[in-house]
Swiss-Prot record:
It comes from Xerocomus spadiceus (Boletus spadiceus). This is Inulin-specific lectin. The lineage of its organism: Eukaryota, Fungi, Dikarya, Basidiomycota, Agaricomycotina. Signal peptide: none annotated. One of its GO terms (molecular function) is carbohydrate binding. It comes from the Eukaryota. Keywords: Hemagglutinin, Lectin, Mitogen. The keyword Transit peptide does not apply. Homodimer. Inulin-specific lectin. Has hemagglutinating activity towards rabbit erythrocytes. Has mitogenic activity towards murine splenocytes. One of its GO terms (biological process) is positive regulation of cell division.
Length: 13
């Protein structure tokens, strides 16, 4: 999972 700019974890990848 990649980290978003706002500091939220996204379940992508």
């Amino acid at each position: 999972c990649s980290k978003g700019g706002v500091g939220r974890g996204y379940g992508i990848g």
